[in-house]
Regions:
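Active-site residues of response regulator receiver
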Residues: 8, 55
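Active-site beta3 strand of CheY-like receiver
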Residues: 47-53
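Receiver (REC) domain active-site loop signature in two-component systems and cognate sites
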Residues: 58
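Two-component/phosphorelay signaling modules centered on CheY-like receiver
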Residues: 11-32
């Protein structure tokens, strides 16, 4: 099962995201949730989720700063930025910071989430395969050094 971390300062939104989708149908489970970027950064380090859905506008640390810090720290999972603002500059900033997807909260429903999750599942599968391939190459390289 792939792990999901939900990040939003609004408890109702977090509960909606948790309950709207049958996560297991896509091979995911909600591993945790956070109310701001600082809490999410700590949880992401501990849980190592494959997918993080984060609000953009939050107190203490907003979603864009969270995305920047996660990417700078080497996080290679899928990041989805959520916002209620249909603002091109905000979308652009989120994507430039390292978000893979951007979703408007007022467009979230079961159908849009299912469509997004099918796409995300493919991304997560591909990233896992790439990581596995990288680990195998590193192991082969170490073995090659030992046999010299």
């Amino acid at each position: 099962m792939y792990q999901v971390l939900l990040v939003d300062d609004d408890l109702i939104v977090r509960m909606f995201l948790k309950d709207t989708l049958e996560w297991s149908k896509f091979g995911f489970e909600v591993a945790g949730d956070a109310r701001d970027g600082e809490e999410a950064l700590e949880l992401a380090g501990r849980l190592k989720p494959d997918l993080i859905l984060t609000d953009i506008s939050m107190p203490r640390m907003d979603g864009i700063e969270l995305i920047r810090r996660l990417r700078a720290g080497g996080y290679d999972g899928v990041l989805v930025a959520l916002s209620c603002h249909d603002d091109f500059e905000l979308v652009k900033s989120a994507l430039q910071s390292g978000a893979d997807e951007y979703l408007l909260k007022n467009h979230i429903n079961e159908d849009s989430m299912c469509e997004m999750m099918q796409n995300i599942r493919s991304q997560v599968d591909e990233r896992r395969k790439t990581m596995d391939d990288r680990r195998q190459l590193q192991a082969l390289a170490r073995e090659g050094k030992k046999s010299r």
